[in-house]
C-alpha cells in the first residue's frame, strides 16, 4: 500500500487478494464500501483504489468479481464440514494402520521391518509437525507486527485521510456531477468519516503476556504430541461455523480465515503423502515380495479389480466433465475422455492377448494361473501314468538291501525342507490263502519344475532323489504320479535328471 504525493490512496491488484486478512479489523477502510453500498463501476484503470473508490477485481464492474464475495460463496455448508471430517478419518486410519503394522512386526520379532516401518511413520509425522509449527510462528508474529505497525501509524493515517478528503472535494469540482458519482462521493465521505472516527481511533491494549504464553505453550504441546494437523482440521471447522453464526459485517472475515486455514492443512496433508505414505507403500511391497507372501490373483478377483477401476475412472471423469470450465476446456474435453477410456480398454485387450497366446507356459485360460493356484488338497484325485511307462528309467535304481538301507538313512537327515513329493507307503498285506499282491510305492509330484529357476530346480531334484532313495528298498520300484495334466510333459525331464 502506498500513497501518492498529493495524498491519494493507491492499492495494487496484488494487495486486494490478501486484504481480508491483512486488515481484518478495518473492513470499511480496506474495501471502501459502506455496508450495503454497491461498488462504483464507472471507468476503468489500473485497478487502483483512488480516494477510497471501490473497483471490481475483474475490471468489468460485475458483482461476482468484486472483492466482497457473494452470499453463496461466503456460506459455509454442511458438505464442507463433512469433507473435513472425512479427511480427519482418513488421516487417523492411515497413521493407525501404520502403527498397528509396526507393532505386528515387533511381536513377530521382525525387528528390521519394524524399524523401517516405524522410521517412515516418524519421518513423515515430524516433518508435517515442523512445517505446521513454523507456519503458526509466522502467522502469530505477523499479527503482532501488524498491530504494532497500526499503532505507530495513527498520525500518518489521519494525514492521509485528510489529504484524500481534500482531493475528493477537488475531484468533485472538476468532474461532472452525475447521479452515480454523487452517490459514490457521498458513500466515500461517509466511509472516510466512519473510518476516521472508529477504525483509526485509540486501539485497545496489546495482548497480555499470559495470553501469548498460553497460546505458545498450547501449540507447542499439540505439535509435540503430533496433533498439529488434527488441530488445524478442528480449527477449520470452528472458523466455518463462526462464519455462519456471525453478523454480516464479520462473516467474510471468518470465511476467509477458514479458506486460508483449509489451504494450509491441505498442503500439510500433501506433504504427509509424499513423505510418509508413498515410501511406506514401496516398503510394504518389498516386504511382501521378499517374504514370499504374495498370493496368486484368481480370475474372478482380477475381473472385480478391473471393474472397480473402470467404475472409478468413469465417476471421476463424469464429475470433471460436469463441473469443468466450458470456455477453457471445450477444445479438448471430449478427446480427453476418449483417450482415457480407450487407453483403459487397450490395456485390458493386450493383457488378455498375453495370457491367451503369448504366455511362456501356454494359454492360461481354463487352467491355473500359477503354481500357487494348484489344488494342494491331499484328498484330490491324481492322474496316473501307465506303470510300465513311468518306471522304465527307475528300475535300475534297485540294489542290495543293505546298501539301500544305508543310503536311505544317509539321505533321510538331509534337506530339511517341506516334502514336495508325497510318498505313499506300502500297505502291509493280510494273511490269506492266496498269494499276496505286491503294493507299489507312488511318488506324487505336485509342482511344475519348469516354472522355477535353475537353482530351485536343483533343490527339487534333490528332494525327489531323497524320496526315491528312502523307498528304494521295496520289492517294486517307485512310480511317478502327476497331479495336473500339464505336468505330464515333464516326466522325462524328471527321469533323465535323477
From Swiss-Prot:
Q: Which cellular compartments is it found in?
A: Cell membrane
The UniProt similarity line reads: Belongs to the XK family.
Where does the sequence pass through the membrane? 81-101, 111-131, 302-322, 332-352
Chain residue ranges for the region called Disordered: 24-46, 166-203
Q: Which gene is annotated as encoding this protein in its UniProt record? A: xkr4
- Could you tell me which species this protein originates from? Tetraodon nigroviridis (Spotted green pufferfish)
Q: What GO biological process terms does the UniProt entry carry, in alphabetical order?
A: apoptotic process involved in development; engulfment of apoptotic cell; phosphatidylserine exposure on apoptotic cell surface
List the protein's name: XK-related protein 4
This protein's UniProt keywords: Cell membrane, Membrane, Transmembrane, Transmembrane helix
